[in-house]
Structures are given as structure tokens and as C-alpha cells.
Amino acid sequence: HIEDGVALTKFLYWIKTLKKLNLTEQKVEKKLENFRKQNKNYLYPSFDTIAGTGPNGAIIHYRSNKQSNRKINKNDLLLIDSGGQYKWGTTDVTRTICFSNVSKKIKELFTRVLKGHIAVAQCDIKKDQVGHNVDKKARQSLNKIGLDYRHGTGHGVGFFLNVHEGPQSISKNNYVKLEQGMVVSNEPGYYLENKFGIRIENLVFIKKNNNKLSFENLTFAPIDKDLIEKKMLNKKEVKWLNNYHRLVFKKLSKYMNKKELVLLKESCSNI
């Protein structure tokens, strides 16, 4: 997961510092794949990369083709859902990024998705708790304003096996008990048809701590702070985000060149 975080973070530096966004979705997919290929332990994608910009980002299981392959516009959000198969395991990560100032509404929606992501990450797993119970926490902030998303909050992930692997998941209809050692995704989102998509995804590991189960993050990559409305986050959420970014910097910084390190430091600074 650290190796995958290095590839994704180097890609994010590359795309964020381009002088001209002369790119299409398929070029983005190939470029990210090239960054992963630089690692000798990388074997192949764990699934077809989703790179959806603007309205294509609102298609939950989007796959680009010759007809849909959209140019990247600096005024649109870009949703990138990707993963790799490495000798040491399987990754799956989603980041949503922007290239210019965004509206207050988009910031609000992104922050509500982030609040859901943090709610799952901070969740204590009670005895015999099932995925259905955790799923509610992820949707709470969106539900407060009458919004939701049409997919599960998380799916099980195998170890150099299937990137979607049961029986565990975090979803409305899953009643499988969450147990120590399971890996699941944490990926709430929001999608406005024909406009944009937002998703934040990390993989998490269920660990035992003082006779309690909790989630430990496995994914290390910056979350775009330009999309966050800080005043919507409570103190615990701000602390979680700052601690997460501190850990991202600690895990990845030694693999960055000088220019990449400058952006990583800024991306991981406190809000």
C-alpha cells in the first residue's frame, strides 16, 4: 500500500503541476499505470481504472471508450478510482481532485462525503456488528440534507486475489459480521447526474485493540484540501484528517524527489 501510494502521489504531483491540461481520460489512465509500472513489485491493475471528468465522474462504474473519452477541463472535477496487484497484495484507492477554485456547493458536498469517510475510519466495531450498521454512519452527513449514493460504502478485498471479495462488505443489505483480519474499502461518494462525481476511498484493515475492533487505514495518499470546507468539520474530524496526512507524509516522503516533496508537504499540512 505504501508502494501504491508512492505511485499515486507522484501521479498527483505530475497532473497538478501541468501548465496545460492537454489530456483525455484515457491518457490519464495510461499515465497513472506508467507510474505504477516503475515499481518492480507491481504486476498489473487490480481492475480497469476509472478516470471520469465532469459528467463522466457521475457514472459510478464508468469505463472510458473512444466515444466517451472526455478531455480534462480545469473547471471540472476529476475522479480517479484505480488499483494494482503487487507481489505483496491488492490495492484499491479513489481520489477526487480539482484544478481551479470550486463552488461553495461542491466544497460542501465533498466535505459531507469526507465526513462520512472519517465516520467509518473512526468507527469502533462492536461485538457481532455487521456491515449494514457501519454503512449508516457513512451516509449520515449526506442524509441530513436529503442526499445519498447508489452503491455500498465498502467491499471486501482479497490478498493478491479479487479486488471485490466477500462475504464481508459495508452496505445497506450486508449482515455478515465484521471480524478481525478482514480488509474492506471505505468509499462514500456523491454523484450529480450530468455534472460531476465525488468519491474518497481508502482500504482499511480490521484490527483488535484492547479487546475492541477498529479500522486501521492501509491507503496512503493525500486528500485534496482544495475541496474541503473546514468550518463543516468538527474538532475530531479535523484531528483525524491532520493525523492521516501526517502519516501519509511520514510513509511517502522519502520516496519523493525535491519538487514532489514540496507539494507533498503542502498537501499534508494541517488544515
Language model segments and positions:
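Active-site neighborhoods and metal-handling regions in enzymes and metal-associated proteins
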Residues: 1-271
